[in-house]
Amino acid sequence: MAGKKLDEQMEKVIRNNYRRLTGCLIDRKMTITTMESITCGQIASLITDTEGASAILKGAFVTYSNEAKIMQGVPEAVIETYGVYSKETARAMAEACKRAYRADIGIGITGTTGNIDPNNQDSVPGEVYYAVAVSDTIIDGYFQMGEQDSRLYYKLYAAEKVAETLGDVLGVKMEAVLA
């Protein structure tokens, strides 16, 4: 598997990157929402670590199961056709949460940490798909995570990859963590 192993210093940089992003969203009065599976709400949590985030975070969905994704607007046919761990599902998650909260930005992220998902036999450990929906555009990404020391570090690693993409979209200079 590819990817760096996170440590405490990297965690601080990731948290600081989210403060930058959240500050930018507050300044621009842009709203954001998330539909998170692998990160289980970590991205929304990082956003709300900045004072004033209630002005921009419209809400967030933690959709750990396939059923939860479907209940929140991901078409069942997308999951059945492409699998829950796919760019198509991540894109549908980003669109569904953006639409549900009428937000400017929607983030969808799905994947596995270091184990096979017993409910989805097609899962590959460390495989992550994500999407950022802004206006009528969706930017999606894929990466493989190497083994991390804790569940928190898996979530932070995945959250940082999303932050890098969101930073590019917003034109926010991010401090490099995973490069």
In which residue ranges do the predicted regions lie?
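Short alpha-helical segments enriched in small residues
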Residues: 2-179
